[in-house]
Regions:
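Cleavable N-terminal export/targeting peptides
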Residues: 1-36, 70, 92-94, 109-115
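N-terminal, post-signal peptide beta-strand-biased segments of exported outer-membrane/organellar beta-barrel
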Residues: 17-76
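Repeated loop/turn-to-beta-strand initiation elements of outer-membrane beta-barrel proteins
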Residues: 54, 68-72, 90-96, 136-143, ...
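Residues that define the transmembrane beta-barrel architecture of outer-membrane proteins
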Residues: 59, 78-82, 123-127, 157-165, ...
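Outer-membrane beta-barrel architecture
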Residues: 62-64, 83-87, 128-134, 164-170, ...
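Sequence/structural signature of outer-membrane beta-barrel proteins
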Residues: 76-78, 100-108, 146-157, 184-194, ...
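Detector for outer-membrane/organellar transmembrane beta-barrel domains
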Residues: 167-259
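Outer-membrane beta-barrel "beta-signal"
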Residues: 275-282, 288-290, 304-317
Length: 317
């Protein structure tokens, strides 16, 4: 089942990820906590209406543009037939179709030296759809549906046929020290495995720490149920800071931690760090290691390697 859950996450990211995520990854990993970021397109498809943009991570691309109506396209994986986004007014849609043909097995006789054996793999068919809408008095709503026909496919995925449903809601909600609420629900129903349900509820707020420095604090609750096994997580916490280092460079740090009430344990704090560079015509976002802070001058001026693990180049107009 762990393979199934990981596969679904990969498909949602690889099949319908239409925008830069490096900034969000460095700030805790949840795009919904940063409504102004283009990474929201993958959570709330209606966010495509806020941008004309083109970006790449060195392997894939995404571009969307338009005036009253937006259209966006991305390359996706080698077996993706189409990855499309659309937006108009307060609505948005992401659609992905993945089709990989069946490979028939070839078996060779022991005395046939010219024959090349081929391992047979079953065909793959994945339909991945997201719809989003901003509703007055309710907030931002995103709905996700995925239907797949997938089995062991060589070095790709090992995943049974099944269906995934998801719902995300974000709204302004003044409560205690927080300004916004985020609720998400996800249900994974593979044909031959136990269903998996995930439920999360978070409160978050942004902090004006100083000039050109913004912080985020989020706290929430999570519940996961897999067959007869359930796990309650509370509290889940995210703390992140983004600060202008110079007039063209931004430094980012994000920390997450969740406590399992069911197992009375935690994996501890998970840190992430990143940099953003504004080159005028485009923006470069990258994830970096914590050693950025041990020798910042040489790192930012290029005299020492940044040890960047991934990047995004984004152009907006």
């Amino acid at each position: 089942m762990k393979t199934i859950k990981n596969t679904i996450v990969l498909l949602m990211i690889g099949g319908l990820l239409f925008s830069s995520t490096e900034r969000v990854n460095a700030l805790g990993g949840n795009a919904a906590f940063w409504p102004e970021d283009e990474a929201n397109i993958s959570v709330f498809p209606q966010a495509v209406n806020n941008f004309n943009l083109a970006n790449t991570d060195g392997e894939d691309f995404y571009v969307s543009w338009g005036d009253d109506m937006k259209f966006g396209f991305s390359g996706g994986t080698s077996s993706d037939l189409v990855n499309l986004s659309w937006g108009m007014n307060n609505m948005g849609l992401n659609f992905g179709l993945n089709m990989t043909p069946e490979v028939e097995a070839v078996e060779c006789a022991a005395d046939d030296s010219d024959c090349v054996e081929v391992e047979g793999v079953e065909g793959v068919s994945i339909i991945n759809t997201q719809f989003g809408m901003t509703l007055d008095g309710v907030g931002d709503v995103g709905v996700h549906f995925m239907n797949s026909t997938m089995h062991d496919h060589g070095d790709h995925f090992d995943y049974e046929d099944g269906m995934t449903l998801g719902l995300t809601l974000r709204r302004a909600q003044e409560l205690w020290v927080f300004s916004h609420a985020l609720v998400n629900f996800n249900y994974e129903a593979p044909t031959d495995e136990d269903a998996v349900m995930n439920l999360g509820a978070d409160l978050f707020t942004h902090l004006d720490i100083a000039e050109n420095t913004t912080g985020l604090f989020a706290m929430g609750f999570g519940y996961t149920n897999e067959g007869e096994d359930g796990d309650i997580h509370f509290p889940k916490m995210t703390f992140a800071v983004e600060s202008a280092w110079t007039d063209w460079a931004t430094v980012r740090a994000g920390f997450t931690k969740d406590w399992s009430l069911t197992n009375t344990s935690s994996a501890g704090v998970t840190p992430n760090f990143g940099l953003g560079f504004n080159y005028g015509s485009f923006v470069l976002d990258m994830s970096v290691g914590s050693d950025i802070f041990t020798n910042p001058v040489q790192k930012v001026t290029g005299f020492d390697s940044l040890n960047a693990s991934s990047f995004n180049l984004t152009y907006m107009w």
